[in-house]
């Protein structure tokens, strides 16, 4: 059965979990227009993490992704990056997520409100979660 699922035996014995951070708000410089380069705008992020950890069995924070710390890292990185495009912001966040060894894959959606007149919001999604 393990070979059929193409999952390493060690990973199978550990827990497989989908963690989601929804509605993470980050105020940062984002956009191409001159006026966007001088004032912060709000981005809203939805992040899915496919993790392989023991937290479902152990009930210990040390056995999973510390999503409070991850949220802080994401916020700091986007503030520092001053991206011009939401597509780039999604990639920046994705790279932070997969740097954690417990994260097998990640999917990041970045939404920017009021990007274009008569449009409620624009969003970009980067990454995949296996099996979705």
Regions found by a protein language model. Name each.
Residues 2-132:
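N-terminal, polar/charged subdomain of small-to-medium soluble alpha/beta proteins
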